Amino acid sequence: MILVTGAAGQIGSELVGELRARFGSENVVAGKHRTPLPEAMELAGPSALVDVTNRQELDTTIKNYGIKTVFHMSSILSALAEQNVETAHEVNINGVFNLFQISLENDVEQLIIPSSIAAFGPDTPKTNTPNDTIQKPNTVYGISKVFTELMGNYYQQKFDLDVRGIRLPGVISWETEPTAGTTDYAVAMFYGAIRSNQYECYLKPDTRLPMMYMPDAIKAILDISKADYLSLNHHCDFNVHAMSFTPSELANCIKDINPSFQISYKIDPLRQSIADSWPDSLDDKAARMEWGWKPAFDMRSLVNDMYKNLESKLT
Ligand code: AKB
């Protein structure tokens, strides 16, 4: 039995659908918290209230459903975490700790917990960032992701708990909008282009960040989950790379489809400083060698597919 926390979120909402298609709707519990689940998801299979900061609730859900695998998708993202340090600490650090403990106590067999490019910081080599390198993030979100990686590796080594994770870049998708991240501009730009032919970007035009299209993010999460345990040297800290671009490059690519699209810039100092502390591209040799990671989408194919799907969703 599988539990997905954060099932109403950007990644969780698509992951639940994919897992239910593969393993049967009745075998995948959609874990919800504040945001209600989409009606179709609620109707299609089991769901439960899961607030990871509430150990009792987490324990009850895992026991009641006999959960053996958890995909932990709920997290307070970078920009919101900077504005709500307490909540970020509660959810991203205490919540993750609860999950490790409760999983151990209930014989959960596998825990997938994504990390992020935020686990790097201003002292990390910025281009082609190695998998194993300096990790001194200067954001609370980044610190919580380093905590998650290190604790995950600790539980794996000390208790043989099968914890796995990848460092996700900005994820671009058309089904559910991301909230409160720094890379969200890349999704919002498509909404702006389709709705009003314009978008005001909060990052500078030349801010280069790693990005990935949702089908590749889902594939990475599922592929790491089914990778042969014995072939893994890393566990909770895999770089995965698909593409890197700047707001101005993305705008130009969107203009190829919609020539009326106009971009303007009004910089948000908070999100700009977060973006400036992150890598612009990643070396993902470890993921490619240890479990065969390979993305399918590059920037052009992402933009074409995203524009087409979002346009038909919005019109
Ligand atoms: C964010 O912008 O906070 C996230 C991330 C890169 O982890 N999308």
Which residues does each PLM region occupy?
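Conserved beta-loop-beta element that borders a ligand/cofactor-binding pocket
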Residues: 115-116, 149-175
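Flexible, glycine-rich beta-alpha linker
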Residues: 121, 136-139, 164-183
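NAD(P)H-binding glycine-rich loop region in Rossmannoid oxidoreductase-like domains
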Residues: 52-91
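Glycine/proline-rich active-site loop of Rossmann-fold NAD(P)-dependent oxidoreductases
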Residues: 146, 159, 173-187, 214-215, ...
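Conserved Rossmann-fold NAD(P)-dependent oxidoreductase catalytic core, especially the SDR/UDP-sugar
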Residues: 97-140
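A conserved pocket-lining segment of Rossmann-fold NAD(P)-dependent short-chain dehydrogenase/reductase
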Residues: 168-178, 188-212, 216
